[in-house]
């Protein structure tokens, strides 16, 4: 037996017990004739004591222990003289009588501490060492607890967990697929699933009216803090349901997770916001409603006064930052540079301060009378000490998105985005289609199987851009943590959808014939939702990136620097797969 207890288990009630522990050397220090070693495992840290007066030879061996050596000890639990209130085992120590070195270790490239000295790149390369840190390990423990709770919750509601294939056919809509060549079928390829969408719909046709899966999904797209090329969904589908049924079920799951994971009781129904309102007031389909600063359109007030930037604009909008009138010129210049960054793309920013006497001082005073500036103040309901920030542009949607970035930045600067405050909502009534300039055609905003709202179906023939989707996203703190829709279950309506998306009947049959054929055998009304497990965990853990809650993540270039993947294949493998690599210059 390597251990009788873990390194996080022993307490004052265990004093005088003989125990056996195994783990890694966190640190050691010599003080007079005593050597103290902190022994660590997944469960915690226990202090070991080696005493020269009791066993000089054993103490000498302990002095040679290096960081991260794997050791086993036998000893007696003793009450600590100098207690450590920061760890659960801080009232006790182990007086060691036997030491067995199970494995030596070279010096790690960074300290295995919560506040490590290792940068992101080095920690990614040695991820197996990074996972020894309690800060990282606790994220995976939280992830485990979440999956257990999800399975338990859905099981009690009659959902069946069903695994769907990972090797499937490629589909043209959405993000790029990762493809896998087939050795047995030269020149043909599988795709890794972006989601189990069509497969779970087939399960509904099969009569499995409540399905779920903790599903690994893959998307070959540009990465950012909340995206990885492979990620995990809590994927669900239900038959004989309407939108309200799905929302009720999964709002219930969200409230359950908040209760059991964060001990937060959410009793009120989550608010619902139409997509058009979210874009108008926040410039985002995933608004952070922890704080205000809603957009105010200012065209009627600011246009036509000789300031050409505004006079030529298609949209003028602003936000009011309460109590921020004390911003210095340097801070305001920094905000201007922020919105002018290439990834945001604004051409400039106008500001107006509300002075203590109620007058308004702006950066464009020479174009506007105090009377007009007072109208500006009234439009926001601004008070003395407030700061108004204004952007304009020739594309209303683009300018609102720029203003959204400015709003979020101000929320950060003013401390309004507390990670321990949670604001949940449903965004509903999305457009069914969006126009793609690149493709020159309508694209499905969600996917081709999303049902239009019944009251908008008649618009498919006359004004498809005005059709709203029977779709819904759950947003928490400005992060889309899940989304879904009621699906099309009628073959004729699905064919109409393919037609509007530019599919020929032949191409639709080639890509989705298996689904359309299944519908002919009686498809029930159905709908579903997928939660992003990684995003939920990062939200509950207060992380800035989902990377920190994935055991072995990729970096921002999609590389696994630990495994050095992706990598070139051996020529013999390429030959076996009938592949030739032709890299364009």
Curated annotation (Swiss-Prot):
Localization of this protein: Cytoplasm
An example molecular function term from Gene Ontology annotations: ATP binding
Residues holding ATP: 219-221, 228, 480, 532-535
This enzyme's EC code(s): 6.1.1.12
Domain of life where this protein originates: Bacteria
Chain positions covered by the region annotation Aspartate: 197-200
Keywords of the record: Aminoacyl-tRNA synthetase, ATP-binding, Cytoplasm, Ligase, Nucleotide-binding, Protein biosynthesis
GO biological process, one term: aspartyl-tRNA aminoacylation
Broad class of the protein's primary localization: cytoplasm
InterPro entries in the record: Aa-tRNA-synt_II, aa-tRNA-synth_II, aa-tRNA-synth_II/BPL/LPL, Asp-tRNA-ligase_1, Asp-tRNA-ligase_1_N, Asp/Asn-tRNA-synth_IIb, AspRS_core, GAD-like_sf
Catalytic activity entry: tRNA(Asp) + L-aspartate + ATP = L-aspartyl-tRNA(Asp) + AMP + diphosphate
Pfam families: GAD (PF02938), tRNA-synt_2 (PF00152), tRNA_anti-codon (PF01336)
Binding site for L-aspartate: 173, 219, 446, 487
GO cellular component annotations of the record: cytoplasm
Stretches that traverse the bilayer: none
Similarity remark: Belongs to the class-II aminoacyl-tRNA synthetase family. Type 1 subfamily.
Chain's role: Catalyzes the attachment of L-aspartate to tRNA(Asp) in a two-step reaction: L-aspartate is first activated by ATP to form Asp-AMP and then transferred to the acceptor end of tRNA(Asp).
Subunit annotation: Homodimer.
NCBIfam families registered for this protein in UniProt: aspS_bact, PRK00476.1
Name of the molecule in the record: Aspartate--tRNA ligase
Organism placement in taxonomy: Bacteria, Pseudomonadati, Bacteroidota, Bacteroidia, Bacteroidales
Name of the gene encoding the protein in the UniProt record: aspS
């Amino acid at each position: 037996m390597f251990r009788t207890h873990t390194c996080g288990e022993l307490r004052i009630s265990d004093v005088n017990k003989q125990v056996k522990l195994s783990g890694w050397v966190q640190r050691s220090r010599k003080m007079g004739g005593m050597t103290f070693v902190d022994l660590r495992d997944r469960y915690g840290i226990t202090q070991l004591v080696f005493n020269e007066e009791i066993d000089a030879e054993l103490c000498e061996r302990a002095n040679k222990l290096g960081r991260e050596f794997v050791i086993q000890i036998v000893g007696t639990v003793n009450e600590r003289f100098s207690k450590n209130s920061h760890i659960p085992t801080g009232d006790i120590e182990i007086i060691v009588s036997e030491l067995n070195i199970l494995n030596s270790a070279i010096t790690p490239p960074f300290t295995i501490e919560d506040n490590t000295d290792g940068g992101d790149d080095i920690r990614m390369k040695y991820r197996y060492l990074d996972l020894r840190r309690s800060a990282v390990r606790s994220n995976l423990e939280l992830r485990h607890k979440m999956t257990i709770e999800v399975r338990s919750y859905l099981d009690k509601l009659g959902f069946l967990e069903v695994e769907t294939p990972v090797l499937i056919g490629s589909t043209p809509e959405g993000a790029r697929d990762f493809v896998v060549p087939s050795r047995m079928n030269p020149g043909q390829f599988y795709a890794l699933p972006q989601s189990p969408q069509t497969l779970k719909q087939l399960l509904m046709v099969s009569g499995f009216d409540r399905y779920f899966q903790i599903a690994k999904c893959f998307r070959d797209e540009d990465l950012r803090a909340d995206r990885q090329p492979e990620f995990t969904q809590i994927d669900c589908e239900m038959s004989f349901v309407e939108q309200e049924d799905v929302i009720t079920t999964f709002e219930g799951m969200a409230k359950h997770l908040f209760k059991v994971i964060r001990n937060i009781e959410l009793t009120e129904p989550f608010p619902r916001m139409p997509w058009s309102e979210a874009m108008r007031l926040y410039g985002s389909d995933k608004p952070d409603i922890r704080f205000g600063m809603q957009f105010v359109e200012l065209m009627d007030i600011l246009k036509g006064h000789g300031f050409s930037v505004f006079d030529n604009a298609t949209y003028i909008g602003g936000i009011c930052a309460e109590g921020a009138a004390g911003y210095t010129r340097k801070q305001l210049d920094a905000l201007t540079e922020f919105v002018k960054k290439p990834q945001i793309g604004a051409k400039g920013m106008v500001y107006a301060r509300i002075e203590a006497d109620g007058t308004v001082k702006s950066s464009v005073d020479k174009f506007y009378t105090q009377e007009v500036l007072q109208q500006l103040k009234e439009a926001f309901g601004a008070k003395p000490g407030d700061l108004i920030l204004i952007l304009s542009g020739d594309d209303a949607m683009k300018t609102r998105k720029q203003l959204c970035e400015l709003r979020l930045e101000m929320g950060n600067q003013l401390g309004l985005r507390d990670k321990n405050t949670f604001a949940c909502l449903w965004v509903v009534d999305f457009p069914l289609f969006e126009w793609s300039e690149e493709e020159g055609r309508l694209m499905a905003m969600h996917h081709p199987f999303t049902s239009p709202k019944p009251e908008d179906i008649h618009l498919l023939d006359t004004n498809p851009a005005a059709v709203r989707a029977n779709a819904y996203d759950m947003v928490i703190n400005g992060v889309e943590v899940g989304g879904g829709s009621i699906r099309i279950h009628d073959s004729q309506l699905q064919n109409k959808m393919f037609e509007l998306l530019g599919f020929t009947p032949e191409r639709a049959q080639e890509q989705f014939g298996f689904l359309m054929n299944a519908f002919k055998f009686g498809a029930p009304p159905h709908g579903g939702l997928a939660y992003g497990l990684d995003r939920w965990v990062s939200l509950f853990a207060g992380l800035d990136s989902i990377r920190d809650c994935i055991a072995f993540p990729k970096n921002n270039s999609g590389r696994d620097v630990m495994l050095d993947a992706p990598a070139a294949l051996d020529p013999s493998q390429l030959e076996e797969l009938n592949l030739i690599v032709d890299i364009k210059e």
